[in-house]
Design a protein with these regions (language model features):
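Short, catalytically relevant binding-site loops at active-site mouths
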Residues: 71, 114-117, 151-153
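C-terminal non-catalytic interaction/assembly regions of soluble proteins
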Residues: 127-235
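Structural motif
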Residues: 106-111, 145
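Short glycine-/acidic-enriched loop or helix-start segments at secondary-structure transitions
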Residues: 3-7, 119-120, 155-157, 216
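N-terminal glycine-/serine-/threonine-rich phosphate-binding loop
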Residues: 94, 104, 124-125, 228
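Short, solvent-exposed amphipathic alpha-helical segments in soluble enzyme
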Residues: 5-16, 79-83, 123-132, 161-164, ...
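Short, glycine-rich nucleotide/cofactor-binding loops
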Residues: 113-125
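Conserved, well-structured core segments that form the ligand-binding/active-site neighborhood
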Residues: 1-104, 136
């Protein structure tokens, strides 16, 4: 879970078995705006601290978690007391999945792969994950280029429709952020807030989408080919 630093452990309880009120609280603007809420960050991460407390309050006593590779093969298993097992796997996962970023880049190309590239809600995870790294991968004013067909449009679920409505109905990115900070939002719509934060500092190009008008309505840039996307980013 990107907000928690690493998934697993306490997340089995919260967010896994949490009610909507707790999910709305932990996914709200105050948590997502906090500079400690970053991928791979545990220390000083308020989201991690909140769901760890939730797991403690319901007396989570035992977990069995795994670390997978890109082909879903098991690399490491840990079981036992939640904090000890979780921390063991986090330390191992860091050696597998974390890559030092020597500096910020003008352009980053990345995708989420099938089946997540089938709708814009899921495809937008790629730029947000890179943006919410401890050091954002792309400099302010730079570009994320994301290949995604988005044949399902924004997505058909309630959260996916809330995401699209929030993105498309806002006059601009800044007003979307201001409205969310002032009024909050229901679960699922946090992705619109996350993407507004991304788009406040960078631009996102979606390549090969079957719904280019939907991409434009969501404050992102459609491109037919990777060559076109690179040309747009180079202008």
């Amino acid at each position: 879970h990107q907000y928690a630093g690493y998934s697993g452990g306490r997340k089995t309880v919260a967010v896994g078995a949490a009610g909507e009120a707790l999910i709305a609280h932990t996914h709200g603007p105050a948590f997502i705006d906090h500079p400690g809420t970053r991928l791979g960050r545990i220390a000083g991460n308020p989201f991690h601290e909140a769901i760890t407390e939730a797991a403690w309050r319901v007396r989570l006593r035992f977990i069995l978690n795994i670390v997978l590779d890109d082909d879903k093969r098991i690399l490491r298993v840990a079981a036992g007391e939640p904090d000890m097992a979780f921390n063991e796997l986090v330390n191992f996962a860091r050696s597998v999945y974390e890559v030092p970023i020597p500096h910020q880049y003008d352009i980053a190309i990345g995708g989420v792969g099938y089946p997540k590239d089938s709708n814009l809600y899921q495809a937008s995870r790629a730029p947000s994950y890179l943006f919410f790294a401890p050091t954002p991968v792309v400099r302010p004013g730079g570009f994320f280029i994301i290949p995604a067909r988005c044949e399902e449009g924004a997505g058909v679920g309630a959260g996916e429709q809330r995401f699209f409505n929030a993105m498309s109905q806002a006059a601009d990115v800044q007003s979307s952020l201001e409205d969310a900070r002032r009024n909050g939002y229901p679960p699922g719509q946090q992705r619109a807030f996350v993407m507004a934060k991304v788009l406040e500092q960078t631009q996102v190009i979606i390549v090969g989408s079957e719904c280019p008008d939907l991409v434009t309505a969501s404050k992102m840039i459609p491109a037919k080919t990777m060559a076109e996307a690179l040309e747009l980013a180079a202008q």
